[in-house]
Amino acid sequence: MTINDRTAVMTLIASLALLSGCATSVAPNPNATHSYHDELGEFRELPRARLGALPFKGPFTLYTAADASDLGTHTYKAGPLEIDNERERGIVYTRRGGFLDIAHVRNSADMTAYIHARALLAIERGWEVFEFKGHEPSTYRVELCYPDDWEQLDIETRHRYTNELALRLAQRVAFDVMTWHEIITWHGYKSTIVIPENNSAFTYDDIPSHALGVQLAADALRTGRNFDLEMSRLLDEALSDLGVVESDELELAMGEVEGAWWDRLRGPERRLLDIGTDDGSIDPWVVDGHADEPRAYSLARMDDIEGRDFSGFYRVQIDPNVLEGFAIRSVIGEDREYIDPETDFPVLIKDIADSLKVDRVQDLQEQAARR
């Protein structure tokens, strides 16, 4: 096949893809994004991976409290000669936002920035597909479906849409990445290979931490200033706004729910399984007697960008590439290559809830009645 023949075939495939809606072929090959390192800037490499902690004490919980007044400077990825004073991990408690894992907040924020760089590049170049990997072996394929009038939009309007679409897509996909980690962990995946981690899946600090992290990242990226410095400032402000408490009240709040939410030997007694499927928001679990008005964490929406609905702009597919993928496909009931977060995550969450014999979203009053 000559170069001209190959070009003609690719053009025909691309045309058919456009006629059918979202892309059904890879044009250009998403692996090409790896040759655009200069354009991906400071986010061309995967961010550092931080070790989370369970929000209670016990064997293998890796529990440690974080000092919200001394979190250091957020660092996406420290170079060999750079000073790194980030306090990367630890649990805090907030009176409006519940328990939070600082490592998970930071990890989800950095994943948002990592995806945003790729989404922005893809949309600016008019690509229909881009792929990336996180810290696990799974591969994420993101298909982009541009509106029919995309090329007819004036440059300024398309530029505004591009920037906002990349930000919101990055938030939502990063949240999916973090949720996927919880799902495969529940099914037995071990990032440390040896230590069992299913006890850490969907603990009541995880989902709120992810939701907060992706929002802070978007806010930091919107400023156009240094990401690490903005993340440091925004994280401090967010924790203060959520009513972060001192270590002694953290201990009291943790003790109040011992036996109801967690057990020192058995681990978590309750799992927070609300991933915002129904209404796009996550209600934190706050401890009675240690709470002000709880504040829901809102996920980015695609249905109103300058008054325009972009709900169908993207689609995510996950190729598990982990042994736990077989069990996950069994739950879904279909032996297919990709997992679709939009349709499959609710099924997988329901399966977890059924195995725990709980409703998908636990109500605090019901929990209190079980104490």
Give the residues covered by each predicted segment.
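Bacterial N-terminal signal peptides that target proteins for export
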Residues: 2-11
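Divalent metal-coordination and catalytic microenvironments
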Residues: 182, 206, 212
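Hydrophobic/aromatic-rich structural module bridging two neighboring secondary-structure elements via a short loop
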Residues: 202-203
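Bulky hydrophobic segments
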Residues: 22-199, 218-371
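Bacterial N-terminal signal peptides
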Residues: 11-20
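A structural signal for well-ordered alpha-helical segments within the folded catalytic domains
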Residues: 174, 210-214
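Intrinsic disorder/low-complexity signature
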Residues: 1-2, 98
